């Protein structure tokens, strides 16, 4: 079964954007931080990646016998604002997981690898670009 996604984005008079999906909406804004009304588009993309990774981990943990007491993720990305090769996209994404769990380090690392392969956002970004995605895990017992 194919899952479909439908998002409508509207440019507002103040140059912010409103994205609408189902009954939800989010304000995005590419202007400088001191005037912005929401995340920039790339920050929203990275937030979506983090949310997908966390949701996938939460869903898959019971089946993999992983106990999650607390789960956090920090995502950073980098791109050139004046590229010599004409590529303006993200060149690297770093995912830092912090997992509070009694499971072993080996179990957690295998689980995160499993999650990354099943997260649709991670798969999409990894599969269609030359983007390097680094994954780092901190286990807290």
From Swiss-Prot:
Quaternary structure, per UniProt, is: Homodimer.
Specify the superkingdom: Bacteria
- Species in which this protein is naturally found: Mycoplasma pneumoniae (strain ATCC 29342 / M129 / Subtype 1) (Mycoplasmoides pneumoniae)
Q: Which InterPro entries match?
A: KH_dom-like_a/b, OsmC/Ohr_fam, OsmC/Ohr_hydroprdx_reductase, OsmC/Ohrsf
Family that this chain belongs to? Belongs to the OsmC/Ohr family.
Checking Gene3D superfamilies in the record gives: 2.20.25.10, 3.30.300.20
Q: What class of enzyme is it?
A: oxidoreductase
Q: What is this protein called?
A: Hydroperoxide reductase
What are the protein's GO molecular function terms? Answer: peroxidase activity
């Amino acid at each position: 079964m194919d899952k479909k996604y439908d998002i409508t984005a509207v440019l507002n008079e103040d140059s912010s954007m409103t994205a609408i999906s189902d009954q939800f909406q989010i304000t995005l804004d590419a202007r400088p931080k001191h005037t912005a009304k929401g995340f920039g588009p790339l920050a929203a993309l990275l937030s979506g990646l983090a949310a997908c990774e966390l949701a996938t981990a939460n869903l898959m943990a019971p089946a993999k016998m992983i106990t999650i007491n607390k789960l956090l993720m920090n995502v950073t990305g980098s791109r050139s604002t004046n590229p010599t090769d004409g590529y303006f996209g993200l060149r690297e994404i770093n995912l830092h997981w912090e997992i509070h769990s009694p499971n072993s380090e080996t179990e957690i690392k295998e689980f995160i690898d499993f999650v990354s392969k099943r997260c649709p956002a991670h798969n999409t970004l990894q599969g269609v670009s030359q983007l390097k995605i680094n994954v780092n895990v901190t286990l807290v017992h």
